[in-house]
Structures are given as structure tokens and as C-alpha cells.
Curated annotation (Swiss-Prot):
Residues 135-205 form the S1 motif domain. Residues 369-494 are annotated as: 2 X 51 AA approximate repeats. Belongs to the NusA family. Sequence repeats lie at residues 369-419, 444-494. PROSITE patterns: KH_TYPE_1 (PS50084), S1 (PS50126). Keywords: Cytoplasm, Repeat, RNA-binding, Transcription, Transcription antitermination, Transcription regulation, Transcription termination. It comes from Salmonella typhimurium (strain LT2 / SGSC1412 / ATCC 700720). One of its GO terms (cellular component) is cytosol. This is Transcription termination/antitermination protein NusA.
Amino acid sequence: MNKEILAVVEAVSNEKALPREKIFEALESALATATKKKYEQEIDVRVEIDRKSGDFDTFRRWLIVEEVTMPTKEITLEAARFEDESLNVGDYVEDQIESVTFDRITTQTAKQVIVQKVREAERAMVVDQFRDQEGEIVTGVVKKVNRDNISLEIKSEGMAGNAEAVILREDMLPRENFRPGDRIRGVLYAVRPEARGAQLFVTRSKPEMLIELFRIEVPEIGEEVIEIKAAARDPGSRAKIAVKTNDKRIDPVGACVGMRGARVQAVSTELGGERIDIVLWDDNPAQFVINAMAPADVASIVVDEDKHTMDIAVEAGNLAQAIGRNGQNVRLASQLSGWELNVMTVDDLQAKHQAEAHAAIEIFTKYLDIDEEFATVLVEEGFSTLEELAYVPMKELLEIDGLDEPTVEALRERAKNALATLAQDQEASLGDNKPADDLLNLEGLDRDMAFKLAARGVCTLEDLADQGIDDLADIEGLTDEKAGELIMAARNICWFGDEA
């Protein structure tokens, strides 16, 4: 029998390219399982195989515990120390028992356990092999095409055969069709250690694919002379990528385009002809958005840092180009910059600002007990809300011509009183529908919008997580994109426990 064990270890180790120690451990586990099946009671068994001779010994063991709940597998510390005073809780007491003989049932049980353990070892090796390659481009051969995904064989160093990866349908480009035997490239974006199912996940549609292709085609990126700051994609159609240089002598956009467009064309070809805009990064968010809106010319831009939005004005003749087909250009620019962008004509922006200024003047005259001329001065100085007047540093108000400290103090006091009155009126009108603390504390949601949600019965994070974008579509000041972000943030906290 000992020779058979050594032969099995050698054969499986060679066939699966697994370490011999892993096979010995699998065999020991298999023999222990087979031994347990010989007993009517549930016992704990350990098998030890001699790595040189193949002989094995079998031991029944009891775990030392403070209080016994399973007499067939546990023993008290007091009883264990009758045999050995050095033992402690958590140690084992062992007695050697007769080893199993390999009849048909024992062999079948051992085989099942060995197969399972070998499979677990193989999956562990896949994780170890590819963990360091996560985020990099890999090349694979299409093994099987399914309706929802395709299976790839990826070359794996140090393993018998190839590892299997999966590209889900959403990770492929639109209209992209593959057949068994095709060689394709993609970014390995997930390596999962789960005991069942796919372990390696590859994508061709995520922005990381675009970034890694440029890293291959543009040596300056690998040398860290040029840095990729952000990327946004409408897979298979259009993309934008933001780059900056760490060497002022090098033009990052020109380097990424390449001689006669060779570098960007190579990336575009790999992505099915995807049009790629290379955008110059700027630390100034407004200037960066102007760059990202290319090829459209921006006439003016207004930044609202509190709401993290920008109003972009273009000439009427450029409006269609600025928005892009189905909103593609402005959507990609928004994703690239991380700002919510509102594109409109110069006339529309002027009309909007006039309406906002008129509304602010009305609020100031109504709640601050000042005349229209004074209210107009405040608006022209950049103040548009009661909150700004109530809490802005006093020195900013004192910079306005004609205002002294007593006037500023009185103005701030009136603004605070007005805010308190409005808050009380708002809460009274809501009745029981008031936003809970968890909703008020949600990042990206201001107090005003929280009360608007509460007025619709969305009072808690759970309520928000249960909403769809269409449910919130008619709330003033809430775009579909912003609604989607808030809903997903609530779901991440409520459903997935993400407190970040």
C-alpha cells in the first residue's frame, strides 16, 4: 500500500503541477474521512503519512476544552492532564487506532476527497498566480461562447494547462462577436478566491482597458514622464482620456497621438474603431472641463462648488456639437472631470443667471427687510442665498463698499433668524415626513434636497435605496445622473454595508 500512495502522489503532482506536499495533505484528509465513516459516532481523526516510505498511522483525537459539549470529540483540561500535565486548552489528546484497509467504499471516499482537495489547491494556485496581474492586460484564446459570457484560456506559468477566465457580456464591446479559437486581449480586473464559479474576470469595456492600451503604446507613460489622470468611455463608440506631463519639454497630447496618429490609431483599432479624444489635464477644474468639452468651443463657464456643478455656455451654433449625439460629449466630459455639467447657449445662461439673481433679490428683500437696491448690491457681490450671508466670514461682507461692522452684524443676525423661521415652516409643512439623520448625513446630498425627498416620503436611507431614478425624476433641481448616484450611495450603505 505504501508504494501505491507514493505512486499516487507522484502521478497527481506531475499531472496537475502541484507541490507533492499538497497531494500528501489531500491524501491524509481523504484517509481521515474514510476512517470516520467506519465509526457510528462522530469522531475526530488525524492521519500522518511518512513522506519517504508511504506508510501511514491513524490517530483518534480529542480537543481540550473548558466545558465538554461533544464527548466523542472533546475532553476537559482536568482529564487531559492525567496523561500530560503540559497540555492546555486548545491542544489535542491523541490515541493511535487501526488504520483503514482499502476496500471499495474506502477507495471511493478517498478518491472523492482527493479530487476535491486537488481542485481546491488548483484554485488557490490560480489566485496566487494571477493576483499580481490584476489590473494588467492579459491575452487569451476563446474556449467557449455562451449567451451571457465567453470563456477564455489564459496561459499560466507553473501550472499544468491553462487557467480559465470569463468575459461577461457587459465587459465586451457592442457588436463584438468572437468564435472559439480567437485570440483576444482584455484587462484582468478581478481575481476571486471563491470555491465555486469563475475566478478570473476580464474586461474590454471598462476605462482601465483604454488606460492599459495607452500604457503599452506610449513608452513615456511607462517611464512616468506622462501621467494618465482619468478616462471615460462609451465602449466601442467614443472615449476621452486626460493626460499630463511631468516634463515640460514633452507635449503629452502629441506623444499619445503619435507620429501621424499611429499610437492613438493602434488603441482605437484594438477597441473596434472607438474614437478617442486626448484631453490635456489641468489642475484648475474649470479649465480642465473646457479642455474636456473639445471639440466644442466654450464661451463661458460658471462653477458652483457647493453643488459640484458647472454651467457651460456655448454659441447657439455649437450647442449640438457640445452636447454630442445622445448627450455623449457632455456625458463623457462629466465622467472624466467628476463634475455635473449643464450645457446651454449663451443667451440661456444669461437668462438663467438673471432669473436666479431676481429670485435672490426677492428673498433678500423679503426676509432681510432691506430695499431692492441693497439686495442687488449683495447679489452683484456674489451672494445668492441666506446661508451665505449668515455664515460667510465677516471680512468678506466688510469688503463691500458702504458696509460697516454693525450693519454686517445686523444683516447676519437677520439671515440666521430667517433661516430658523424657514426651517420651522418647512418641518411643520412636512408633518411626520422629516428626513432622518442618516439621510441628512449622506455624502453628496444637501439639506434642501433632503427635505425635498422627505416631502415625497423618502425619509431614510432605506427609503432612498428602494427608489428608482424614474421615481425621483420630477424633483426640481435633481438630475437623473445625480439621482442615480444618490440611490447607489444609499444602496451601498444599506445593502452592502459600505460605510465609506
